[in-house]
Regions:
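Sec-exported extracytoplasmic/periplasmic mature domains
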Residues: 4, 70-80, 106-110, 150-154, ...
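Extracytoplasmic/secreted envelope proteins and their assembly/folding machinery
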Residues: 42, 65, 69-72, 83, ...
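His/Asp/Glu-rich mid-to-C-terminal helical/loop segments that flank catalytic regions of hydrolases
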Residues: 73, 196-257, 261
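Flexible glycine/proline-enriched surface loops and loop-helix/loop-strand junctions
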Residues: 13-14, 49-53, 124-131, 163, ...
Length: 262
């Protein structure tokens, strides 16, 4: 009433904030679908739980967490019993330094050689359009990915061969980065916006526009099914994916320093 009458008034607030010295304990959330034949071999699918608090994290990384969880639900709902263990991981502390993925690696060094592939979704609510895989992985991925083209003809899927890349010395800015540094394959989907929703990751990234309503339901649905197909297929191979030719082999530089005679 006072506002409608344009009357001036004063408000007084008593705001009490309480702070604790860090570090604050934070936890990864990990679901396990146990392997029936190779329980000590793994396929990882993941997204990260935290977000910049200027928005709600509906896209970064709600679009990755929701697809990861739905893919896991689809596998379980279908009665899936993978040969090797599937780890469904929602990482903690990604935005502040990849803390969750770094911590898991430090605690599980013995598992790194037994990870067939690490798939991480952290790039917006776009739809899988293809993959680029190494020569040694080609036949396995061709087999595993073949059903993806049967899901929805509106979203064609293309598999391509890639050249070996250099193994990174430092992690890039998402949770697959620390795994790549350790030599773990992190082959994931290439994604796009084939229906022209004009989604722009740059528009929402770490801003107040990172909201749930920026998600694209039909892309998210298709991504969930494609992720379930991919992860379950890799988990059911008779062998781990080959790492041959995944990274460029670094040649040892010859020792050209001459020893000094005393």
């Amino acid at each position: 009433q006072m506002a409608e009458e344009r009357r001036y008034f004063q408000l007084e607030f008593d705001i009490r904030n309480h702070f604790k010295m860090g570090p604050v304990p934070y936890h990864n959330v990990i679901g396990i679908i146990p392997g029936t034949e190779f329980p000590d071999e793994y396929v990882i699918m993941s997204g990260h739980l935290d977000a910049y608090d200027v928005g709600t994290g509906g896209i970064d990384d709600g679009s990755g967490v929701s697809v990861t969880m739905e893919a896991a639900r689809l596998i379980m709902e279908a009665g899936g019993k993978p040969k090797r263990t599937i780890l469904v991981v929602l990482w903690a502390g990604e935005e502040f330094g990849l803390y969750g993925s770094h911590s898991w690696i430090e605690r599980n060094k013995d598992k790194l050689d037994k990870i067939s592939n690490m798939i991480n979704r952290d790039g917006g609510p776009t739809v899988p359009t293809g993959m680029s895989v190494s020569e040694a992985m080609w036949e396995d991925f061709a087999l595993v990915c073949s059903p993806i083209n049967d899901i929805n003809p509106e979203f064609p899927f293309k598999l391509e061969k890639s050249e070996p890349g250099e193994k990174p010395e430092k992690a890039w800015g998402t949770d697959s980065g620390p795994f790549a540094v350790e030599g773990v394959p992190t082959t994931g989907f290439q994604t796009g916006d084939p229906k022209g929703y004009n989604f722009s990751y740059g528009e929402i990234w770490h801003t107040e526009r990172d909201l749930f309503n920026k998600s694209i339901p039909e892309y998210q649905e298709h991504a969930s099914i494609a992720t379930a197909v991919l992860v379950y297929g890799i988990a059911n191979l008779d062998h781990l994916l080959s790492r041959d030719g995944y990274y460029i082999e670094k040649k040892k530089e010859p020792n050209t320093k001459k020893s000094k005679k005393k």
